Amino acid sequence: MARSVWKGPFVDGYLFGKAEASRASGRNEVIKIWSRRSTILPQFVGLTFGVYNGHKFLPVQVTENMVGHKFGEFSPTRTYTGHGSDKKSKRG
């Protein structure tokens, strides 16, 4: 279920400070974040965030198309290794 419009988008408070500090420094370094639940805002466009997936930080370059989505959507937590193969049919 979607979030109510009157509540506005959810963003952890510390992300604003990190984003502003990164913009002020002028360097495009990766901003490490653990907040997968935060919504991507227009202020974050052009910045690179390292979103934690439970194992490592995956770099996410924020574009205009990502605004309104959550950070967690762009760093998958599970790796699909495929279903087990049928060993009998592969024998020649």
Curated annotation (Swiss-Prot):
Belongs to the universal ribosomal protein uS19 family. The keyword rRNA-binding applies. It comes from Gluconobacter oxydans (strain 621H) (Gluconobacter suboxydans). Protein S19 forms a complex with S13 that binds strongly to the 16S ribosomal RNA. GO terms for biological process: ribosomal small subunit assembly; translation. PROSITE patterns: RIBOSOMAL_S19 (PS00323). Disulfide bonds: none annotated. InterPro entries: Ribosomal_uS19 (IPR002222), Ribosomal_uS19_bac-type (IPR005732), Ribosomal_uS19_CS (IPR020934), Ribosomal_uS19_SF (IPR023575). This is Small ribosomal subunit protein uS19. Keywords: Ribonucleoprotein, Ribosomal protein, RNA-binding, rRNA-binding. Residues 72-92 are annotated as: Disordered. It comes from the Bacteria. Pfam families: Ribosomal_S19.
